Regions:
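Flexible "cap/lid" loop of the alpha/beta hydrolase fold
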Residues: 2, 12-53
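Active-site loop/turn elements of alpha/beta-hydrolase fold enzymes
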Residues: 23-26, 128, 152-154
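Glycosyltransferase donor-binding loop in the core domain
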Residues: 47, 129, 156-159
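Conserved alpha/beta-hydrolase catalytic His-Asp/Glu region
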Residues: 48-107
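Residue-level signal for the nucleotide or nucleotide-sugar donor/cofactor binding architecture
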Residues: 50, 132, 162
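Alpha-helical elements of Rossmann-like donor-binding domains used by nucleotide-donor carbohydrate transfer enzymes
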Residues: 54, 58, 74, 135, ...
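Conserved serine/cysteine hydrolase catalytic core
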Residues: 81-143, 148-151
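Catalytic active-site module of serine/aspartate enzymes centered on a nucleophile-bearing elbow/loop
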Residues: 145-183
């Protein structure tokens, strides 16, 4: 999953912002319904989880069409164990309540950005994502003329975790093409 914030989207710069940009299932114009659903899920355990098993149960309830993994070690990428022994998301859902999480601010920043026509940009989209829909993709395409899109079938918002091989292949192909290795 990705975050898009004021710190990661400078509006203008005399120098190139970056040689390339990869957005992982994030667009400035989010599906508000989907974002609300994700926010509700992420905020449903404000005190964290007593165990990885409890977290896996919550994730399985949110994604009923996915098989519950037998090996829960992958959850270590998304959860952190606190001093109290409870497991909490590494991403703080309160971020969406901050000014930087305001979707209107993100759209305004994109409108003011001057790099969008010169920085090669790839959107890696999970086709089962709750927060990136066709409207958001088309809005981003209008704002970033050279936008490339890698649609990852069967992946939700956590694209890299859902379909890691396809995610890696899309990102590596894009970066190798737009930023070929030297020598």
């Amino acid at each position: 999953a990705s975050k898009l914030s004021g710190n990661s989207y400078p509006s203008s710069s005399a120098e190139p912002v970056a040689d390339a940009l990869v957005l992982v299932d994030i667009v400035p114009k989010l599906s508000l319904e989907g974002a609300s659903k994700v926010r509700g899920f992420m905020g449903s355990a404000p005190d964290g989880f007593a165990s990885l098993e409890e977290a896996a149960d919550a994730i399985s309830a949110y994604y009923p069409d996915r098989p519950r993994p037998k090996d829960l070690s992958g959850l270590n990428k998304n959860l952190r164990q606190g001093d109290d022994g409870r497991w909490r998301w590494h991403w703080d859902p309160r971020w969406m309540e901050s000014p930087r999480g305001n979707p209107h601010l993100l759209l305004d920043m994109m409108d003011a950005a001057d790099w969008t026509d010169r920085v090669p940009t790839l959107l890696v989209r999970g086709m089962k994502s709750d927060i990136v829909d066709d409207d958001g993709v088309e809005d981003l395409r209008r704002r970033v003329p050279q936008l490339e899109i890698a649609d990852i079938r069967g992946a939700g918002h956590m694209v890299a975790g859902d379909k890691n091989d396809e995610f890696n292949a899309a990102v590596i192909e894009f970066l190798t093409r737009v930023m070929p290795p030297a020598g």
